[in-house]
Amino acid sequence: MSTLETWPQVIINTYGTPPVELVSGKGATVTDDQGNVYIDLLAGIAVNALGHAHPAIIEAVTNQIGQLGHVSNLFASRPVVEVAEELIKRFSLDDATLAAQTRVFFCNSGAEANEAAFKIARLTGRSRILAAVHGFHGRTMGSLALTGQPDKREAFLPMPSGVEFYPYGDTDYLRKMVETNPTDVAAIFLEPIQGETGVVPAPEGFLKAVRELCDEYGILMITDEVQTGVGRTGDFFAHQHDGVVPDVVTMAKGLGGGLPIGACLATGRAAELMTPGKHGTTFGGNPVACAAAKAVLSVVDDAFCAEVARKGELFKELLAKVDGVVDVRGRGLMLGVVLERDVAKQAVLDGFKHGVILNAPADNIIRLTPPLVITDEEIADAVKAIAETIA
């Protein structure tokens, strides 16, 4: 039996049976078991930041697995320290005081990073956590409690208590929620760009307003950069576009370039709330995953991020000329293509015929999160293919 025939007989039915079997990849392209080549505009859902089979990752992972594969956090290893140092440097933007106050907790995924942030919020002793309507923070119970999408939560009620939802981007509404009892609000969670709901950027000034509100009432500002981080939007962290410094940042996806790794960065008092016994992880900080992350970070520097921003503008410019496209949202290489008709789901299926891998978070929206190494030529070819899928 083929892989696709065997799949539903052995895999729990969380995603259905995939339409194709992928067997290899290089850069921003992947190849299926029939030899068909596709431009990958999804990158494992914003995971393969450096594309497929990047030589820096291959070398780093191969060398590390040959030395030390796993040790647990009962012992120290050099790769985890080096990645933590680099993340703190990127977060602090070389502010020595901020860097000295920042610490990192490593885990295996975005959901786990958000679980850690949830615990940090709880450790403030305050009971209310405010999260955004339509936000997405993961599928584990804690991260799901923070997710403002009732259809994903309904089957698993009751949720962990204390989470309330505000309309994303509505500063006045959020302030009213806080001021009903400000001393009981532990944290405000937000994504700088909501990804799963169709790539919706926060309105201009919203992150700054949240930062000011948090400062006013001693509330933790927690930004979920699981999808937006590691250069995806043209800045290393998307919140840096708005010139704010959160108390806690969660990240994963692109950090390992394809290997599972997540991180929760906390600064100031938020970094001091976790103490021995309060949290833990078996696999978090795995030397091999950290070696991959170190390789990714060695490539994703300021010049690389500037190129991501430029490529994003090229994508927008070309997509704006496509019949049936009414808007292109997002920044860098995290884009939501808003269609005139509800054909996005069909476009995903038709994309295979035209040599592109697409994703549709809504009936009229195509989400593009390609490898950050995609070339201008591949972008042009991809836009032509998208035009054909929605024609």
Curated annotation (Swiss-Prot):
From what superkingdom does this record's organism come? Bacteria
Q: What class of enzyme is it?
A: transferase
Put simply, this protein is called: Acetylornithine aminotransferase
Q: How, per the record, is the cofactor bound?
A: Binds 1 pyridoxal phosphate per subunit.
Gene Ontology CC terms, in alphabetical order: cytoplasm
Signal sequence range? none
Q: Which reaction does it catalyse?
A: N(2)-acetyl-L-ornithine + 2-oxoglutarate = N-acetyl-L-glutamate 5-semialdehyde + L-glutamate
Listed pathway(s): Amino-acid biosynthesis; L-arginine biosynthesis; N(2)-acetyl-L-ornithine from L-glutamate: step 4/4
InterPro entries in UniProt: AcOrn/SuccOrn_fam, Aminotrans_3, Aminotrans_3_PPA_site, Class-III_PLP-dep_AT, PyrdxlP-dep_Trfase, PyrdxlP-dep_Trfase_major, PyrdxlP-dep_Trfase_small
Nucleotide-binding is among the record's keywords: no
For this protein, the record's PROSITE patterns field holds: AA_TRANSFER_CLASS_3
What protein family is recorded?
Answer: Belongs to the class-III pyridoxal-phosphate-dependent aminotransferase family. ArgD subfamily.
Report the SUPFAM superfamilies cross-referenced here: PLP-dependent transferases
Sites where the protein binds N(2)-acetyl-L-ornithine: R139, T281
